């Protein structure tokens, strides 16, 4: 259909309405009036980021269960009109005379989407790219999303060597003939370690009810435990990821009743990158693959 000469953009999310008006004014000659061709933007109070775009000759409506999902729908619709968000300071804005788009819907393939580079920290640009990293500098009016607590390496936070090593060296990795304090991990077959970590994670969750993902992840170096108990399991499964997944699974089981919607995050990284032969993560466990050894110049 021909691009309407007069458009009315309305909705219950002011930021989405503002963005739609901004870009339509940049790519068309349309004017805005409350009596114009209706474009209705509606967001719910949930966290689902799927959205629906319904288009006919009488109106356009974009709907989502969440504000962030609605905003993604707005940017998706604009991209189908030819707009391109290339960088935080570079956009392609075509002149548009027609709307040749059929109704459609979209749902993210990944619940959490992040790019580890400086450009993705720009909140407005990251949302246009449909990223939902909690590291990006987004503002409240851009809508809420999945919240990631403590994001990365957490073993030292869960069991601090400075606090525990002198009195309980058995809590930490055994390698090179002794328990190690520096550049070490934790002994994940030690039941006391599991108990301490489980209680710490439960406290994180109780203290941060607006977060859904909590990291139980190895420190940023090698040093996996090679004590008899750990080594026996890891050798049988062919990787030091075996004791890690068993450990994380146990915490995931412990938090599930009180926090059925929360997830435990961990890494497949360095000595844990290779998957175990038979051990499978629980449904409420997220594994983040970190192939740091790979050459990123080749596909």
Q: Which residues make up each language-model segment?
A:
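Feature activates predominantly on carbohydrate-active enzymes
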Residues: 2-7, 11-23, 48, 55-213, ...
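Short acidic low-complexity segments
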Residues: 28-44
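Residues at or immediately flanking beta-strands
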Residues: 36-38, 213, 263-265
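Short, solvent-exposed polar/charged micro-motifs at secondary-structure junctions
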Residues: 47-50, 225-226, 274-278
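A generic structural signal for alpha->beta connector loops
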Residues: 50, 261-263, 284
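Substrate-binding cleft/loops of secretory-pathway carbohydrate-active enzymes
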Residues: 265-296
């Amino acid at each position: 259909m021909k691009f309407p000469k007069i458009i009315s953009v309305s909705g219950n999310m002011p930021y989405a309405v503002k963005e739609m008006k901004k870009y339509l004014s940049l790519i068309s000659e349309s004017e805005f009036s409350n009596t114009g061709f209706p474009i209705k933007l509606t967001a719910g109070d949930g966290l689902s980021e799927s959205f629906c775009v319904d288009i006919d000759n009488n109106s356009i409506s974009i709907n989502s269960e969440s504000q962030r999902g609605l905003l993604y729908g707005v940017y998706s619709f604009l991209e189908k009109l030819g707009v391109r968000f290339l960088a935080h300071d570079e956009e392609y804005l075509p002149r548009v005379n027609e709307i040749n788009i059929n109704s459609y819907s979209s749902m993210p393939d990944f619940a959490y989407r992040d790019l580890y580079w400086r450009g993705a920290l720009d909140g407005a640009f990251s949302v246009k790219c449909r990223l939902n990293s909690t590291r990006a500098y987004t503002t409240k009016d851009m809508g809420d999303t999945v919240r990631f607590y403590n994001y990365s390496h957490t073993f030292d936070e869960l069991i601090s060597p400075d606090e525990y090593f002198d009195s309980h060296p058995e809590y930490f990795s055994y390698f090179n003939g002794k328990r190690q304090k520096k550049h070490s991990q934790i002994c994940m077959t030690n039941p006391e370690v599991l108990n301490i970590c489980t209680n710490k994670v439960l406290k994180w969750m109780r203290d941060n009810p607006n977060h859904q993902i909590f990291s139980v992840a190895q420190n940023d170096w090698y040093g996996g435990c090679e004590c008899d108990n750990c080594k026996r399991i890891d050798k049988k499964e062919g990787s030091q990821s075996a004791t890690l997944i068993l450990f994380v699974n146990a915490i995931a089981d412990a938090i599930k009743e009180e926090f059925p919607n929360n997830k435990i995050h961990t890494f497949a990284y360095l000595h844990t990158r290779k998957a175990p032969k038979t051990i499978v993560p629980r449904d409420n466990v997220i594994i983040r693959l970190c192939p740091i050894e790979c050459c990123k110049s080749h596909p």
